[in-house]
Design a protein with these regions (language model features):
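Catalytic cores of soluble, metal-dependent hydrolases
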Residues: 1-54, 68, 81-237
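Short, solvent-exposed beta-strand-terminating loops
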Residues: 52, 56-78
C-alpha cells in the first residue's frame, strides 16, 4: 500500500464535505479516499489517454454536475500526471465566488470532457439517475444501464467481464446507506457484491473507492462497511 496522502491519526475528527481530501491510499489498480473528488486524479494516473474504457458508477449520488470553466483544467489533457496537491488546489473565480475546480460531485463530467474515450459505455447503479441530466451535461454520457440493488450484487462481474473494453469502477460506500446514514443492506449482501466484483478484477483497469463519511452516518459506519469490501477484494491490512 502506498499512502499518497497518509491517513491522519485523528481522522475521526476530520470533515470531508464538498472539497476536503483527508487521505488517499493506493494499492495495485485500487485507490481509496474519503472524498470522491480525488477519483478523477486516480484515473489520470492509471489510464491510457488513447485507450477506450467502460465506466461503472456505483453510488447513491450521480456525481454528474459540471460547469467549471474548461480552461481552468484543460491543461490536464496534456499533463495528466500532476501531483494530487496540484489537482486538489485548482481553483476558479466567477461572479465574486471562488471555488475549487474539482469537488465531490463534478469530477466525472470534467474528466469526461478531457477524455471522452474513457466513458465509451457507462453503467450506473445509482437510485438518483435514470439518464444523464440535460442541465448537467458538458457532453452526454452513454448510459447503457442503471442497475437496481437486486441485480447489482449478483451481476456486477457479468457486466464487467462481458464488455470488450476494460472498466473504470467507481464505488462510493454511501451506496449501501440511505440519506439519513442508515445501512440498507446486510453484511452478506455487501460481501457478496465485493466478492463478485473481485472475480472480475482482470477486466478492471482501476477501482476507485470513496468512503464519504458524512453520507454514511459517520466515519465508524463508513470504515466498517469499507472493511467488509476491502477484505473481499484483498486489500485489508
Amino acid at each position: 500500500m502506498e499512502p499518497i496522502i497518509p491517513m491522519p491519526e485523528d481522522i475521526l475528527n476530520k470533515n470531508s464535505g464538498i472539497d476536503n481530501l483527508n487521505f488517499l491510499l493506493h494499492y495495485p489498480k485500487v485507490y481509496v479516499m474519503d472524498n470522491h473528488l480525488a477519483a478523477g486524479w486516480c484515473w489520470l494516473q492509471e489510464l491510457d489517454p488513447e485507450f477506450s474504457y467502460c465506466f461503472f458508477h456505483i453510488d447513491r449520488h450521480e456525481d454528474l454536475r459540471g460547469g467549471t470553466r474548461f480552461e481552468r483544467y484543460a491543461f490536464l489533457k496534456g499533463n495528466p500526471h500532476v501531483s494530487i496537491e496540484v489537482y486538489t488546489g485548482l481553483e476558479y473565480e466567477e461572479n465574486n465566488y471562488k471555488g475549487k475546480v474539482f469537488v465531490w460531485d463534478n469530477y466525472i463530467k470534467q474528466i469526461q470532457r478531457l477524455f471522452p474515450n474513457w466513458f465509451s459505455k457507462c453503467y450506473f447503479a445509482c437510485p438518483n439517475v435514470v439518464s444523464d441530466p440535460p442541465h448537467y451535461t458538458l457532453m452526454p454520457l452513454n448510459i447503457v444501464y442503471n442497475a437496481g440493488p437486486l441485480e447489482l450484487y449478483n451481476n456486477v462481474n457479468y457486466w464487467v467481464k462481458h464488455e470488450q473494453n476494460p472498466f473504470i469502477v467507481n464505488l462510493d460506500i454511501d451506496y449501501f446507506f440511505d440519506d439519513k446514514g442508515m445501512l440498507l443492506y446486510s453484511d452478506d449482501y455487501i460481501k457478496s457484491f465485493a466478492n463478485n466484483l473481485h472475480s472480475a478484477k482482470d477486466d478492471i483497469a482501476v477501482l476507485t473507492i470513496a468512503l464519504s463519511p458524512e453520507c454514511c452516518g459517520g466515519w465508524e459506519s463508513a470504515f466498517r462497511v469499507y472493511g467488509l469490501i476491502a477484505k473481499e477484494i484483498g486489500i485489508s491490512e
